[in-house]
Amino acid sequence: MREAPHVLGIVLAGGEGKRLYPLTADRAKPAVPFGGAYRLIDFVLSNLVNARYLRICVLTQYKSHSLDRHISQNWRLSGLAGEYITPVPAQQRLGPRWYTGSADAIYQSLNLIYDEDPDYIVVFGADHVYRMDPEQMVRLHIDSGAGATVAGIRVPRSEATAFGCIDSDESGRIRKFVEKPLDPPGTPDDPETTFVSMGNYIFTTKVLIDAIRADADDDHSDHDMGGDIIPRLVDDGMAAVYDFSDNEVPGATDRDRGYWRDVGTLDAFYDAHMDLVSVHPVFNLYNKRWPIRGESENLAPAKFVNGGSAQESVVGAGSIISAASVRNSVLSSNVVVDDGAIVEGSVIMPGARVGRGAVVRHAILDKNVVVGPGEMVGVDLERDRERFAISAGGVVAVGKGVWI
């Protein structure tokens, strides 16, 4: 049996998330609550920890307070064993400036790599919803001899124009990496599907350091991992693709195997929540063999009183549904739905309250939103448009702490 390689995890968590506004008005995108009990960053951290990659640096930047607090409170590992998950804010090692891109974030954090001296570096994004065993991708990277490996998910060619697309040969070597092409390349075994980059990369350490340092000296670079570093390594013949459909996650069902969602817009964020609520969900939160770890707050169980009910819904701990109806919705912790209220097809974040006789439909309510008695959200879009953000798909989004 070969010795396990020394792997360092780097999570890119500096995303501002403008397209998720107002959910990102007061927090970084990876800190946005998701699924009733989690934040977006919990998915990548769970995947790394489940694979026993237990030395992880989370590079943060914009509005990172709630993200830093979440990591420190809910992701404490054993320091005695040399294990850690640590948030690393912009260090300004090169002067008083923020990170100029994801590659620059790593460049300004090279000291972390030198201190750890890993064999390989796992560089993953922080704002996607999925399960993955990264150890399988690391094994393929080592066996292939590539300097960089990019996780690719298969999508129909007609849907690939909005993503970074991978053109690879039959051996998995990447011939070209193209951002949002008008004519996406097919995969070697299926011309009607395209490998789309998931924003997850494995690097041999020296290859990453050399590429990052060369990129830092390039005045014409945007200093982006997907836009600059990967194309540079593709041109050097050093990059390979990992087919995400080959990833076997313990406990996965046929229905949710290969599930991955970019939730960078309000509509995508909403749709990913609707994937959770059916009897046989598209994405199963209840896989005990590959758990998603989230908030560790000690809360009372959810309670349904006075005939209150929830159908095809996820309801978080501490919530109370009193003589109200909840359908096809995801409610986070400590949500109260009062007598006679109706919540349908909605996402309700922690601490929100829906008052007596109120109606909430096709909406996202951020933390601590209060919908007053008899008020309506998502019923009259023209009226809502004057008060709230509305997505292209007609989802009403109400920002944190708003009273209606």
UniProtKB/Swiss-Prot annotation:
PANTHER family: GLUCOSE-1-PHOSPHATE ADENYLYLTRANSFERASE (PTHR43523:SF2), GLUCOSE-1-PHOSPHATE ADENYLYLTRANSFERASE-RELATED (PTHR43523). Keywords: ATP-binding, Carbohydrate metabolism, Glycogen biosynthesis, Glycogen metabolism, Nucleotide-binding, Nucleotidyltransferase, Transferase. This is Glucose-1-phosphate adenylyltransferase. It comes from the Bacteria. It is an enzyme of class 2 (transferase). HAMAP family: GlgC (MF_00624). GO terms for biological process: capsule polysaccharide biosynthetic process; glycogen biosynthetic process. InterPro entries: ADP-Glc_PPase, ADP_Glu_pyroP_CS, GlgC_bac, GlmU/GlgC-like_hexapep, NTP_transferase_dom, Nucleotide-diphossugar_trans, Trimer_LpxA-like_sf. It holds the Pfam family Hexapep_GlmU. The keyword Ligase does not apply. GO terms for molecular function: ATP binding; glucose-1-phosphate adenylyltransferase activity. Involved in the biosynthesis of ADP-glucose, a building block, required in the biosynthesis of maltose-1-phosphate (M1P) and in the elongation reactions to produce linear alpha-1,4-glucans. Catalyzes the reaction between ATP and alpha-D-glucose 1-phosphate (G1P) to produce pyrophosphate and ADP-Glc. Its EC number is 2.7.7.27. Pathway: Capsule biogenesis; capsule polysaccharide biosynthesis; Glycan biosynthesis; glycogen biosynthesis. Alpha-D-glucose 1-phosphate binds at residues 99, 164, 179-180, 197. The gene is glgC. Belongs to the bacterial/plant glucose-1-phosphate adenylyltransferase family. Gene3D superfamilies: Hexapeptide repeat proteins, Spore Coat Polysaccharide Biosynthesis Protein SpsA, Chain A. It catalyses: alpha-D-glucose 1-phosphate + ATP + H(+) = ADP-alpha-D-glucose + diphosphate.
